[in-house]
């Protein structure tokens, strides 16, 4: 019969190797997505045309690729003059029905707590007691026309800022009820971009099949 000490030792080794396997898998995913930057580049022309048509800033925009893991560089600041990625950061998706840490679900319905796809105008900057610095968004497509009524924002969360260093797939949380929730560091970069722009800046969210 195995002693209690032996049983505890066996369980300890199991959890050690289990955690080690998760870490190896996580870093493998992170390495894969760091080199897969072309998922942003394929949208450069489309977003520039939207910016040009609407009279928005034609030099910079923000892309959010929901086909990338939430803890990875899913959100990107794009330089449309040089066709390059300036900065990247994580972006949590909504926690509503049909969502998981691995797969986002999308909706334009009020109360759905889901993320929405399409083009958004980054509107006024403000502050709130719950999320701090935030930017309002106006939906420009049928897929996100309720963005204002749903109070969809760009804001940050310390949870996202910490967890994206630990996992490629952020566990669902109240960090996002459909908002584009990024790290505090990434939000500061977005703020600097918006503050110096005399024209509205476009945010474009998509998911590749």
Where are these regions (language model features)?
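Cell wall/extracellular polymer interaction/catalysis modules
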Residues: 29-177, 184-201, 206-209
